[in-house]
């Protein structure tokens, strides 16, 4: 188990570095996507992004802005996605759909490098998500 933890930690850092190398620096988005890619069923996660119904737990998750009306207390803008990690109210990042697709491109590329057998499915989901938000 100790070896597995070291490998996951190494992969996590490689993924964080890749995000930063590509100018993507929102720490909570990075943390959540890295956890999704390394600790969860990533294909189900991508399906959740496509359906706008991504995993939510007490300490990790994704919320779409269309779940709130402008008059709601939790409203955080139109066409945005909130990533949270941790229990503090301030432990979150909010990004646009365009930014979401940029972050997903990096994590999908990384995931495919480690799971080549799932490349076709991953790329299909990524393409469907980009088309949904009209991102090239």
Q: How should these model regions be labeled?
A:
Residues 2-61:
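Negatively charged, low-complexity tracts enriched in Asp/Glu with abundant Ser/Thr
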Residues 2-3, 22-25, 90, 102, ...:
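Detector for Asparagine
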Residues 17-18, 31, 51-53, 70-72, ...:
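Generic structural signal for short, flexible, solvent-exposed coil/loop and linker residues
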Residues 18, 73-75, 104, 130-133:
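Aromatic-enriched hydrophobic runs in primary sequence
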Residues 24-28, 42, 96, 118, ...:
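Alpha-helical structural motif
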Residues 34-37, 69, 119:
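A sequence-composition feature that detects small, non-aromatic residues
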Residues 63-114:
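Amphipathic protein-protein interaction modules
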Residues 105-136:
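Mixed-charge, Lys/Arg-enriched low-complexity segments
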């Amino acid at each position: 188990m100790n070896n597995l933890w070291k490998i996951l930690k190494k992969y996590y850092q490689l993924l964080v570095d890749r995000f930063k190398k590509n100018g993507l620096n929102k720490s909570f988005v990075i943390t959540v996507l890295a956890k999704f890619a390394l600790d969860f069923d990533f294909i189900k996660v991508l399906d959740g992004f496509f359906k706008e119904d991504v995993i939510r737990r007490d300490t990790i998750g994704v919320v779409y802005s269309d779940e709130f009306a402008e008059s709601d207390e939790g409203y955080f803008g139109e066409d945005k996605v909130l990533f949270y990690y941790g229990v503090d109210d301030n432990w979150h990042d909010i990004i646009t759909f365009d930014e979401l697709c940029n972050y997903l491109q990096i994590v999908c590329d990384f995931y495919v490098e480690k799971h080549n057998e799932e490349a076709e499915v991953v790329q299909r989901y990524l393409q469907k998500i980009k088309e949904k938000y009209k991102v090239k």
